[in-house]
């Protein structure tokens, strides 16, 4: 791994970060690790996507186990997710023997909900080889792949394949052994925070930071479906503060308006379950989106992102310019003012349209000596606030020339400029 001296200056470290290295070991003169420098820029790189505060939201179609244990159905869902505009698809991988403490007849002693879950998983889980086959199909679409490992063997299987990123389920937020295992692999991590208390979130964040993990936290309400009153998108702000990282939203509510609102509140990662039939057997189908719903969500998220814009100084948009002319007001002369006369307040009125000098310039106009004749009802212009008058010049061209014009101003332009042609807008 690349290292830097313990006394490396910020510029040296920034050069590492500019190369896409998020964590740089700092060593003393004996080569011993003494600290870890981390890129404080909120950037997460998953596959071909770089996720940051300035990037579009990274939208994940969570297929999970909605493939019903069928490789062909899983591939179909991938194809539909691609058509729906997802940036990535995500699956779940479990080693049932490593994950559950009891199997077979011994599960009779478990809670009914656990028995139901075990039954579904035993019927609908894909093997490692089957999952690899589905991953290969995803690669044909040049789409990013993520997966949730539920146990150590699954982590290793995903690493062996070359997975681009891993998701930690809410149920494993306090599974520090799994967190350390995934963090040690150097892969980007998305960590859901459902079913957790804040002190548990803080504890896991401390573990991830100490491990040098590259991660984002997802606000999540782990109920199926999640009541809207419990979603609490505002908590994303607190997660960003706790994690000092990018935040996102993993939704289990019905519909897709909440993820759109999450993006408006700053979520840079969105995860929603994906299915073709909400009546299929399994916990996730009822809170999943159909392909046409997912596509609508993606489109509306992109529209909202475009509408959010930036906090840069405001400028008049192209669409506003015409309305500014048509609806705004200008300073106009109430009488004929001859060149050399001093403009008084009585000489000026405020009238539409907004083709001339704006009304807020009235104080600068009053008291000025006119450098030109102004007819009654004519506009004043910015040039009337300057001492040097722009003089007319006649140009000659050796080819036909024209002007882009609007309907309301083409007549005076024809009379004054005499172009060979006009282009109407």
What are these regions (language model features)?
Residues 34-39:
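Short hydrophobic beta-strand motif reused across regulatory alpha/beta modules
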Residues 40-425:
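Catalytic cores and adjacent flexible loops of soluble metabolic enzymes
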Residues 1, 14, 18, 414-422:
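Compositionally biased, intrinsically disordered low-complexity regions enriched
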Residues 1, 7-13, 116, 197, ...:
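Short, structural beta-strand-to-alpha-helix junction motif
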Residues 2-22, 26-28:
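The conserved cystathionine-beta-synthase
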């Amino acid at each position: 791994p690349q290292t830097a001296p313990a006394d490396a200056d910020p510029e040296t470290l920034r050069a590492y970060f500019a190369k896409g290295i998020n964590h740089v070991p700092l060593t003393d003169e004996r080569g011993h690790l003494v600290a870890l420098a981390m890129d404080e820029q909120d950037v997460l790189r998953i596959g071909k996507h770089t996720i940051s505060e300035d990037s579009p939201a990274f939208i994940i179609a969570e297929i999970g186990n909605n493939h019903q244990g069928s490789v062909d159905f899983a591939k179909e869902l991938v194809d539909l997710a691609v058509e729906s505009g997802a940036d990535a698809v995500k699956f779940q991988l479990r080693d049932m023997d490593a994950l559950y403490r009891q199997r077979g007849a011994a599960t009779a002693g478990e809670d009914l909900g656990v028995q139901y879950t075990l039954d579904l998983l035993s019927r609908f889980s894909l093997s490692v080889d089957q999952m690899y086959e589905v991953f290969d199909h995803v690669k044909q679409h040049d789409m990013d792949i993520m997966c949730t490992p539920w146990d150590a063997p699954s982590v290793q299987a995903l690493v062996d394949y070359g997975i681009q990123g891993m998701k930690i389920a809410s149920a494993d937020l306090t599974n520090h052994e799994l967190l350390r295992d995934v963090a040690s692999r150097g892969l980007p991590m998305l960590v859901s925070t459902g079913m957790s208390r804040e002190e548990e979130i803080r504890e896991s964040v401390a573990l991830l930071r100490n491990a040098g993990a590259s991660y984002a936290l997802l606000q999540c309400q782990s109920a199926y479906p999640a009541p809207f009153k419990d979603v609490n998108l505002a908590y994303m702000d607190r997660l960003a503060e706790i994690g000092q990282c990018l935040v996102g939203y993993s939704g289990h509510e019905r519909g897709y308006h909440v993820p759109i609102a999450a993006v408006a509140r700053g979520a840079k990662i969105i995860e929603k379950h994906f299915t073709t039939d909400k009546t299929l057997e399994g916990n996730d189908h009822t809170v999943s989106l159909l392909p046409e719903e997912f596509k609508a969500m993606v489109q509306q998220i992109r529209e909202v992102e475009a509408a959010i814009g930036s906090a840069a100084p405001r400028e008049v948009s192209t669409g506003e310019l015409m309305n500014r002319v048509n609806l705004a007001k200008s300073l106009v002369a109430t009488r004929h003012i001859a060149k050399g006369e001093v403009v008084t307040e009585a000489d000026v009125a405020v009238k539409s349209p907004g083709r001339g000098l704006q009304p807020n310039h009235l104080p600068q106009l009053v008291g000025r000596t006119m450098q030109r004749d102004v007819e009654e009802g004519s506009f004043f212009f910015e040039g009337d606030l300057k001492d040097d008058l722009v003089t007319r010049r006649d140009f000659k061209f050796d080819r036909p020339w024209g002007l882009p014009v609007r309907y309301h101003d083409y007549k005076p332009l024809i009379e004054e400029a005499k172009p060979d042609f006009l282009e109407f807008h």
